[in-house]
């Protein structure tokens, strides 16, 4: 393997190729999305990145907040609603969403349209992460 090939395998990922590893996250009737995790297996140590597609009428994940991780979302296609801090904010293609850590910013992305909602997720992966789910009074810990 050449140095260029090695660098490419450690630094570049594509979600637009047939061999991209898409997976489905589904918990009926609440959550459903299809996504490809891009940072896994790369040289990145503290970044998480994925492309997610949420079908019409579905939510990507539970309403939650992180104690350590920051997140950003770039809406690539479609429109929907960002549920954040008890408010419902419209989102559409071209919007960039910044979510700081902490209980002030519980968040959830909902597809409230009749077309798929596609977005890029970016996160700073913490060594120890606590995630809280206000709707269900659950807490998750990742190490």
Predicted regions and their residues:
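A short, N-terminal "cap"/entry segment at the start of jelly-roll beta-barrel domains
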Residues: 1-46, 130-143
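Short strand-connecting beta-turns/loops that link adjacent beta-strands
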Residues: 43, 68, 103, 114-115
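Short, conserved beta-strand element in jelly-roll/cupin
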Residues: 51-55, 66-84, 122-126
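Conserved short histidine dyad/triad with adjacent acidic residue
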Residues: 32-37, 50-66, 104
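Double-stranded beta-helix
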Residues: 110-143
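Short acidic-glycine-tyrosine-enriched beta hairpin
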Residues: 85-102
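Short beta-strand His + acidic residue motifs that chelate non-heme Fe in jelly-roll/DSBH
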Residues: 62, 82-83, 99, 106-113
């Amino acid at each position: 393997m050449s140095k260029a090939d090695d660098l490419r395998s450690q630094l570049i990922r594509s979600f637009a190729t047939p061999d991209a590893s898409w997976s489905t996250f589904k918990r009926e009737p609440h959550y459903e999305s299809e996504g490809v995790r891009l940072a896994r297996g790369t040289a990145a140590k503290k970044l998480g990145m994925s492309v997610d597609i949420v079908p019409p009428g579905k939510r990507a994940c539970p309403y939650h907040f992180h104690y350590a991780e920051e997140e950003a979302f770039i809406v690539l296609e479609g429109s929907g609603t960002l549920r954040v801090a008890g408010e419902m904010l419209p989102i559409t293609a071209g919007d960039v969403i910044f979510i700081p850590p902490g209980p002030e910013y519980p968040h959830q992305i909902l597809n409230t349209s009749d077309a798929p909602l596609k977005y890029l997720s970016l996160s700073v992966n913490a060594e120890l992460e606590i995630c809280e789910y206000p709707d269900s009074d659950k807490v998750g810990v990742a190490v």
